[in-house]
């Protein structure tokens, strides 16, 4: 499993930690329990934290057990439908009774209660706030204000905590978080204000370049936002097996698919959006922008002029460009 290209990047990350991670050579053999509290799982944020968390966890560990409260049968069915097709290292095991909790190497819980006597990380979210605790501090159980941004952040922080446990990261290199509450709205620690609700409608005219690892996460969020309008996705590549470990939307059946077209298909599940994928490099796309794109059904008479300044193409201002890099 250590040599499996599908896990090569988590393995490389663990290796780079060196002596700071005692189990860097064994973490893929370990076992994770995913569970939750009924009250939090019943919220929109709780559901999102669970599904986001599972999408991420299966990229770093092939041995996952899911055990949810019996009242969560519908959510369990959703896990089977949305998550099972994405697995590639091993099938997720679903149990009514998880057994001895101390036998798990890490426990990822969607809830509010901390359990410091176990390898337990609890997460939830409220609006723009992401919460996580791997120590003795309980979290607020107020999770009613739905926002996929806060939910994905909470799940991501929680999965990072799980990874620390799997590799047995020494505290001198990275301590476990205890009762963190972080606002994605104003970037404050200890946040209690969930900040504004998302609007009911977000009009966009967006050029989206790069639908790989980071792009996959952004597409996941965009697909759950109340967007209307048009999105162009540009990426010249297809998914390879090495992308399974970093792209939270894809499973084995998606290897070989064009990244841009795949992203557009996800976005088009929102009937208020029109998205189109272009499997080409940005310079090729921009070189024919003013020629061929006018003929696409996607474009209307007001869209192209509004997009041009944002692209920063043909000498037009670049002040609207945004770049995100993993390096």
Segments from the language model and where they lie:
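Adenine nucleotide-associated cytosolic modules
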Residues: 1-327
């Amino acid at each position: 499993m250590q040599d499996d290209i599908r896990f090569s990047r988590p393995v490389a990350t663990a290796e780079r930690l060196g002596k700071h991670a005692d189990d860097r050579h064994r973490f893929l053999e370990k076992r994770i329990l995913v569970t939750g509290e009924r009250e939090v799982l019943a919220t929109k944020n709780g559901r999102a934290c669970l599904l986001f968390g599972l999408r991420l966890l299966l990229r770093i560990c092939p041995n996952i057990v899911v055990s949810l409260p019996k009242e969560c049968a519908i959510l369990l069915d959703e896990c089977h439908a949305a998550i099972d097709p994405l697995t590639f290292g091993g099938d997720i095991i679903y149990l009514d009774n998880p057994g001895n909790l101390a036998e798990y190497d890490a426990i990822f819980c969607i809830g509010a209660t901390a359990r410091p006597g176990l390898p337990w990380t609890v997460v939830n979210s409220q609006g723009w706030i992401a919460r996580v605790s791997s120590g003795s501090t309980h979290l607020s159980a107020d999770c009613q204000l739905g926002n996929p941004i806060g939910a994905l952040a909470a799940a991501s922080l929680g999965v990072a905590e799980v990874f620390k446990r799997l590799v047995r990261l020494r505290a001198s290199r990275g301590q476990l978080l205890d009762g963190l509450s972080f606002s994605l709205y104003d970037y404050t620690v200890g946040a209690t204000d969930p900040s504004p609700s998302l609007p009911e409608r977000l009009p966009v005219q967006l050029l989206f370049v790069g639908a790989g690892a980071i792009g996959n996460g952004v597409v996941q969020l965009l697909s759950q936002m109340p967007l209307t309008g048009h999105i162009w996705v540009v990426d010249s590549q297809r998914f390879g097996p090495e992308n399974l470990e970093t792209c939270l939307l894809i499973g084995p059946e998606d290897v070989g698919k064009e990244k841009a077209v795949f992203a557009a298909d996800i976005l088009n599940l929102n009937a208020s959006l029109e998205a189109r994928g272009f499997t080409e490099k940005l310079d090729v796309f921009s070189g024919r922008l003013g020629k061929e794109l006018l003929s696409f059904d996607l474009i209307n008479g007001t869209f192209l002029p509004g997009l041009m300044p944002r692209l920063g193409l043909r000498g037009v201002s670049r002040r609207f460009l945004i770049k995100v890099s993993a390096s």
